[in-house]
Amino acid sequence: GTVHASPSGRAESSSGARVNIVGINAYHGDVSAALLVDGRLIAAVEEERFRRIKHVAGFPHQSLKWCLDFAGLSPGEVDVFAVSRDPRAHLWRKAWFLARHRPKGTVADRARNLSKLRSLPEVIASSLQLDPARVRARLRYVEHHPSHLASAAFVSPFDEAAVCAIDGFGDFVSTSWGRLNGSRLDTDQRIFFPHSLGLLYLAITQYLGFPKYGDEFKVMGLAPYGEPRYADKLRTLLRLLPDGAFELDLSYFSHWSGGVQMTWEDGEPTLGPVFTPKLEALLGPRRRADEPVQLHHEAMAASLQAVFEESAFHVLNHVQKTTRSARLCLAGGCAMNSVANGKIRERTGFKDVFVQPAAGDNGTSLGAAFAVWHSRPGATRDFVMEHSHWGPSFDDGEVGGEIERQREAFNEQRCAHRQWTDADSLDAWTAAQLADGRVVGWFQGRMEWGSRALGNRSILADPRRADMRDIINLRIKLREKFRPFAPSILLERLDEYFVGAAVDPFMLQVYPIRPEKRAVIPAVTHVDGSGRLQTVSERSNPRYWRLIKAFDRITGVPIVLNTSFNENEPIVLTPGQAIDCFLRTQMDVLVIGNHVLERARSTAPKPEPALSAAR
């Protein structure tokens, strides 16, 4: 039967008997939960948003509870718990590898992790106050890579496509590909541990002095500042083989032989160095985290990005030739490399690319749930992910209550509070604030799924002001100066500003900005003239579309600068966290639903935008 979510979020089916599947990513980075009802996504959220620890590992207790509460389901109504790991996968390969190499660390850490997976029925049962035997009867393990593949394929708009996942590794696999035909997803090929493009990127990220889990984004942002003059040296770290395969030169890496400390406990995941002293002998001494970034570090980042792209396109070109498909669904942590994604259509035979917003391990909960749904006889596909808003929302009453609780704090900072009755006039007023050079925290509707803020938990600013990048990086986000900002653009105006760009509501592809427009939108133009765009349509996010439309009416520019609503923490989830972040930083305006907090204006004049766009 057809499924719809009632205003409470409660899912109802015309046929009466609903199938409720909960997907879970646990004991890995970016733990999360997702809920499907009769094959349609109802809710999805990452545990880091509740726990306030980036990439949190462990078990997604709060995410799981929220998904069920949102849909009005009791834990006993869950038909399947789908977990995106399979401790039994590739056991012979693992045993052979352990016998041959006797590694000290990594694999032993993973073995401990697998023992946690075995106790998962008890953990789920105690989390939801269910009988463990009941959970055990309803638990399905879905291997890590098939979960990645399913997370992209089954929510894509394609009936037929090639599907590929590239990441660090999970369940002993680092790369896999296959094909989607309707409800059927087949895996054709896998590349196994210890060979991994994700691990190559991680090793050089660590070498460049970015030690935190998830810091690869920083290196991708740094790369356009340098020339890839070390590419030949980095090519010695791996060999590209026939049929899309590749091999690392393991003498440069330590992840396979042990000695790498990995923790996947109840907190931020940590990874010790995965490279050996031989890498420093090849490239020179590593950068310490407290040392300044120098020209040769920029060149190394550029070289890594170039070699990663060559290797990824080596895989993808083989996938395209063997599947003969013009469409690609891409997943895995490496699918978050938006710079490479923007070149896929130019450097492979693929014409259409789909990446869902939680392409990393966070999305495997979604994938495991869809894999289980589509393993059912007669299951049909009638869901396409067109937006990312699958998390919690808060009504104006809840927002008002939080504002009352914090009234003393914002009075101290000379902030005024107003509640608007008309959303359209509030959007027009907000657009005028942006055009006047003010930085706006924008909090609307359901929170985004995945690691990008896409207009519901965003910090917004005027893209015409060249100084805006430094203002936000240094005054609000407190992060590295070289990090770029993204343009959110009205879908219907895309070709005016970008060269060869595709529609992408999830901000996962970087494209060149037209040379004549770069001076018009300097704050969202990266050093190489590119922008990681988000297309905004009236259908997928009507409120955000109306705001950008209002900004366009004032300025002639159909774009706002969009960055995630956070300051060295996960993206804000609740109105209280949004108000805290607003008060802690130097944002000028906060719009939550139809409530506005506004700082008293400083008397210093705002610099003028670089250029106004002529229509």
Q: How does the language model describe each region?
A:
Residues 27-46, 51-54, 94-97, 102-106, ...:
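Flexible beta->alpha loop and helix N-cap segments adjacent to enzyme active/binding sites
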